[in-house]
UniProtKB/Swiss-Prot annotation:
Similarity field: Belongs to the influenza viruses PB2 family.
Function, in words: Plays an essential role in transcription initiation and cap-stealing mechanism, in which cellular capped pre-mRNAs are used to generate primers for viral transcription. Recognizes and binds the 7-methylguanosine-containing cap of the target pre-RNA which is subsequently cleaved after 10-13 nucleotides by the viral protein PA. Plays a role in the initiation of the viral genome replication and modulates the activity of the ribonucleoprotein (RNP) complex.
Listed name of the protein: Polymerase basic protein 2
UniProt key word NAD: no
Site residues by UniProt (Mammalian adaptation): 627
One annotated Gene Ontology cellular component of this protein: virion component
Pfam families: Flu_PB2_1st, Flu_PB2_2nd, Flu_PB2_3rd, Flu_PB2_4th, Flu_PB2_5th, Flu_PB2_6th, Flu_PB2_7th
Organism of provenance: Influenza A virus (strain A/Qu/7/1970 H3N2)
Length: 759
């Protein structure tokens, strides 16, 4: 208290006030400010002042032997005085000019390799086309964008390890190169940069540009891929835009684009399967994008999109804490709420159970073509300020906000029943029911909302129920603004959980994402997406399912054959046969399955009736739950090419055609690969040749484990016994001979012994 009184007393004297406000500060403080610390306080002044001196540069002593004292014009290039405090020479800027013109030439072979990002940029600009300049108001919103075209997607730590390994291989320090991409890049760069004379620091800096994604939070009105961002200063100002088409694409943009397409396809497909989460993981792990495993890309790529984030959540990765509704990203900026279940009645007197958010909250809403600020109380929209590219985009944002508000007049505006279903034919949750309903037709919603007189506010304008702008009236609480709303800038990621049905929740239990939020937009991927999972075979239609199913059987024939004879039920239940079922007419699936299973059982029972091509051809039909009936079929129908096509049980058809001489299988006229029939089909006694070096001991003996295929026999040690599957699907017990001398006689005895063992 005493101190404060003293200060007040001092301040009351006018002289004190004058001293503190008018006089210059003690000079020592200023000197300190500009001399303490290594950081240059006024770099441009320092530069101008230095360059005004005669010899502002210092160089190594060796320079005096390589650069003459004077140039052709007689100007002095370096001083005989040495630099104070070091053993370097003082040099004039003219020496640099001389060096650039007359200095030694080094090999330039490494320049395009080290400065690759710059050379590539020049190429893109050279081939790019600049269109006309348009003058108009630019609605820019800040988005997190990639500013560095042509980079790989390594984390800073991974890149650091690669750079150290490439540039300073002998430096001490633990470096762990684990990921596929790290190893590939390291190998590639080491080869490229052999005998490179460019300074290691420069090489390291340029490598970093090539390996790491750099993002900035920038105001953007147009394209956000990195090849547009690198020319942002040329394409959009405050009141103008210049049309531009990039002169080349870069892999990082292609990866981002293809990743989104793959993720959307996978989430859509997983949502309709019996166990969506397991299916999604299986597909993510077996998919490649441009030759890189999708899971590796997901771990490194920061793209935020609904489907991509669902895949990341499934893999246990952190994602952004914002949530998605109606294709917009919502981020709460203030307020809080508690959730409570409430039953409401629609205009059609249908009861809906909705989770009401009680409390005042503010959100930003960011979509592809519109953005908004929304303020809401319990089941009431207080204010919505929206901006967008066009009337349509603004309307979409308004509908989403109105549904999100959960207002009663919105629920009462429902006409007709709400019974929207998702791809798996399950009813959507009430909020998405409402959203779908009004996205189809929002006329009643807008009419019933109510309108109000508005004040004239700079940059804001009203909007009427028919979406026409107005300066006098507007739909209640809703205004259109010229200014966009910035995207949420934080890169913070949170731990989330995901349930079986792919609903992603934060740790408080709020739903952030669900499959309903995944866009239905179809696009063509820039990079090849290879879905190895059988679940994705149907993405290219029924023909692809047919070809892929048969190719899978042929590729795995050795194991399929063993399962066919020993554990058929397990084989019939394989998920690879699931897509095929959609091609078989529903009414007859069960009968086909029963018929084929019976046929296969006869093949197992009756010697000499094993038929490779027939098993392969009919196997997919046996996967459906069988119906027992006495029906026999000579052909089976599959729905491809828009109609039913027949597969003949015995013999070839346009759908399934096997050429015995060429051993090629064609499905619907497309080559499906080589099919090697079992040796004994048609020619007896050949299996003996296969079994040379083995002694046949008799019938199958279960104590020696499951039957091996003939290929697997080579792994047996001498004297070891094993069951083996021979041609007809029969299993015999064999022993690998202890001596090689007797191999010749095996061929003759084998044939007899097989006959005996089987009979």
């Amino acid at each position: 208290m005493e101190r404060i009184k003293e200060l007040r007393n001092l301040m009351s004297q006018s002289r004190t006030r004058e001293i503190l406000t008018k006089t210059t500060v003690d000079h020592m403080a200023i000197i300190k400010k500009y001399t303490s610390g290594r950081q240059e306080k006024n770099p441009s002044l320092r530069m101008k002042w230095m360059m005004a001196m005669k010899y502002p540069i210092t160089a190594d002593k060796r320079i005096t032997e390589m650069v003459p004292e004077r140039n052709e014009q007689g100007q002095t290039l370096w001083s005989k005085m040495s630099d104070a405090g070091s053993d370097r020479v003082m040099v004039s800027p003219l020496a640099v000019t001389w060096w650039n013109r007359n200095g030694p030439m080094t090999s330039t072979v490494h320049y395009p390799k080290v400065y690759k990002t710059y050379f590539d940029k020049v190429e893109r600009l050279k081939h790019g086309t600049f269109g006309p300049v348009h003058f108009r108001n630019q609605v820019k919103i800040r988005r997190r964008v990639d500013i560095n075209p042509g980079h790989a997607d390594l984390s800073a730590k991974e890149a650091q390890d690669v750079i150290m390994e490439v540039v300073f291989p002998n430096e001490v320090g633990a470096r762990i190169l684990t990921s596929e991409s790290q190893l590939t890049i390291t190998k590639e760069k080491k080869e490229e940069l052999q005998d490179c004379k460019i300074s290691p620091l420069m090489v390291a800096y340029m490598l970093e540009r090539e390996l790491v994604r750099k993002t900035r939070f920038l105001p953007v009105a147009g394209g956000t891929s990195s090849v547009y961002i690198e020319v942002l200063h040329l394409t959009q100002g405050t009141c103008w835009e210049q049309m531009y088409t990039p002169g080349g694409e870069v892999r990082n943009d292609d990866v981002d684009q293809s990743l989104i397409i793959a993720a959307r396809n996978i989430v859509r497909r997983a949502a309709v399967s019996a166990d969506p989460l397991a299916s999604l993981l299986e597909m993510c792990h077996s998919t490649q994008i441009g030759g890189t495993r999708m899971v590796d890309i997901l771990r490194q790529n920061p793209t935020e999109e609904q489907a991509v984030d669902i895949c990341k959540a499934a893999m246990g990765l952190r994602i952004s804490s914002s949530f998605s509704f109606g294709g917009f990203t919502f981020k709460r900026t203030s307020g809080s709420s508690i959730k409570r279940e409430e039953e409401v009645l629609t205009g059609n007197l249908q009861t809906l159970k909705i989770r009401v958010h009680e409390g005042y909250e503010e959100f930003t809403m960011v979509g592809k073509r519109a953005t908004a600020i929304i303020r809401k109380a319990t089941r009431r929209l207080v204010q919505l300020i929206v901006s967008g590219r066009d009337e349509q985009s603004i309307a979409e944002a308004i509908i989403v906000a109105m549904v999100f508000s959960q207002e009663d007049c919105m629920i009462k505006a429902v006409r007709g029943d709400l019974n929207f279903v998702n791809r798996a034919n399950q009813r959507l949750n009430p909020m998405h029911q409402l959203l779908r309903h009004f996205q189809k037709d929002a006329k009643v919603l807008f009419q019933n909302w109510g309108i109000e007189h508005i004040d004239n506010v700079m940059g804001m304008i009203g909007v009427l129920p028919d979406m026409t702008p107005s300066t006098e009236m507007s739909m209640r609480g809703i205004r259109v603004s010229k200014m966009g709303v910035d995207e949420y800038s934080s890169t913070e990621r949170v731990v989330v959980s995901i349930d079986r049905f792919l609903r992603v929740r934060d740790q408080r239990g709020n739903v952030l994402l669900s499959p309903e939020e995944v866009s239905e937009t179809q696009g063509t991927e820039k990079l090849t997406i290879t879905y190895s999972s059988s679940m994705m075979w149907e993405i290219n239609g029924p023909e692809s399912v047919l070809v892929n199913t048969y190719q899978w059987i042929i590729r795995n024939w050795e194991t399929v054959k063993i399962q066919w004879s020993q554990n058929p039920t397990m084989l019939y239940n394989k998920m690879e046969f699931e897509p095929f079922q959609s091609l078989v007419p529903k009414a007859i699936r069960g009968q086909y399955s029963g018929f084929v299973r019976t046929l296969f059982q006869q093949m197992r029972d009756v010697l000499g009736t094993f038929d490779t091509t027939q098993i392969i051809k009919l196997l997919p039909f046996a996967a459906a739950p069988p119906k027992q009936s006495r029906m026999q079929f000579s052909s089976l129908t599959v729905n491809v090419r828009g109609s039913g096509m027949r597969i003949l049980v015995r013999g070839n058809s346009p759908v399934f055609n096997y050429n015995k001489t060429t051993k090629r299988l064609t499905i619907l006229g497309k080559d499906a690969g080589t099919l090697i029939e079992d040796p004994d089909e048609g020619t007896s006694g050949v299996e003996s040749a296969v079994l040379r070096g083995f002694l046949i001991l008799g019938k199958e003996d279960r104590r020696y484990g499951p039957a091996l295929s003939i290929n697997e026999l080579s792994n047996l040690a001498k004297g070891e016994k094993a069951n083996v599957l021979i041609g007809q699907g029969d299993v015999v017990l064999v022993m690998k001979r202890k001596r090689d001398s007797s191999i010749l006689t095996d061929s003759q005895t084998a044939t007899k012994r097989i006959r005996m063992a089987i009979n």
